[in-house]
Amino acid sequence: MFNQPARKERRRVARRKKALAIAPRPAAGSLRPQVRCQTFKYNTRLREGRGFSLDELKAAGINKKEARAIGISVDVRRRNKSVESLQLNVQRLKEYRSKLILFPKKLSKPNKGDATEEEMKLATQLKGKLLPRTAWIKPEKARAITDEERKVKVFDRLRQARAHKRLAGKRAKKAKEAGGEVAGGEKA
């Protein structure tokens, strides 16, 4: 309770120490994907995920081992449920790769794609967020609501669509059983 200000200061100092230790790598840590939050309530929100899926890395042309070495977090359990999210994160990976300055492991023998000495001198540590999130949906301009749009009850329609999806299996089973009884009656 009374150690709150001191704890805040300790965290600040720890963050500064970590940033110095990992310099010239970004202070924010490794690059993370943009993912949608779970559940109907929050699925419009974008947040940072744990790591990029293997499909995203493959589409961006980056090896899993190489990705971890150049500061890209990888989550092998993650699956892409939509093409849009895959494309967004692949674009994110490509943008990161283009801005990246790779220091050679051995200065005497630099590999292909490694930075030159001039580029290495210019390299500075990124202090803020690593590739800040971009808006996924572009907002529409305001316009007048038409009479047809007023007649449609959107909330009810969405609820109905969800109910149809939820009950589709039971309804199909019931229809199949009803169809089987009718066919059975004709045979007898």
Curated annotation (Swiss-Prot):
One of its GO terms (biological process) is translation. Keywords: Ribonucleoprotein, Ribosomal protein. One of its GO terms (molecular function) is RNA binding. It comes from the Eukaryota. InterPro entries: Ribosomal_eL13, Ribosomal_eL13_CS. Residues 165-174 have a biased composition (Basic residues). Residues 165-188 are annotated as: Disordered. PANTHER family: 60S RIBOSOMAL PROTEIN L13, LARGE RIBOSOMAL SUBUNIT PROTEIN EL13. This is Large ribosomal subunit protein eL13. It comes from Lumbricus rubellus (Humus earthworm).
